[in-house]
């Protein structure tokens, strides 16, 4: 068996999937728009 592949790291989580990371690119804004349209309670990490 290998190591567990999920190695939690809150800093990386925010940097990669956070709201400001999403807002910083055109496609990221598309992601947020799509999630708003769908009615997601949580838009980003």
Swiss-Prot record:
The keyword Zinc-finger does not apply. Residues 10-20, 27-45 have a biased composition (Basic residues). It comes from the Bacteria. The keyword Translocase does not apply. GO terms for cellular component: ribonucleoprotein complex; ribosome. PROSITE patterns: RIBOSOMAL_L34. GO terms for biological process: translation. Keywords: Ribonucleoprotein, Ribosomal protein. Residues 1-45 are annotated as: Disordered. Belongs to the bacterial ribosomal protein bL34 family. PANTHER family: LARGE RIBOSOMAL SUBUNIT PROTEIN BL34M, MITOCHONDRIAL RIBOSOMAL PROTEIN 34 FAMILY MEMBER. This is Large ribosomal subunit protein bL34. It comes from Halalkalibacterium halodurans (strain ATCC BAA-125 / DSM 18197 / FERM 7344 / JCM 9153 / C-125) (Bacillus halodurans). The lineage of its organism: Bacteria, Bacillati, Bacillota, Bacilli, Bacillales.
């Amino acid at each position: 068996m290998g190591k567990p592949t999920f190695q939690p790291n809150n800093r990386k989580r925010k940097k990669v999937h956070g709201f400001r990371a999403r807002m910083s690119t055109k496609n990221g804004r598309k992601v947020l728009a799509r999630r708003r349209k769908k009615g997601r309670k949580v838009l980003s990490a």
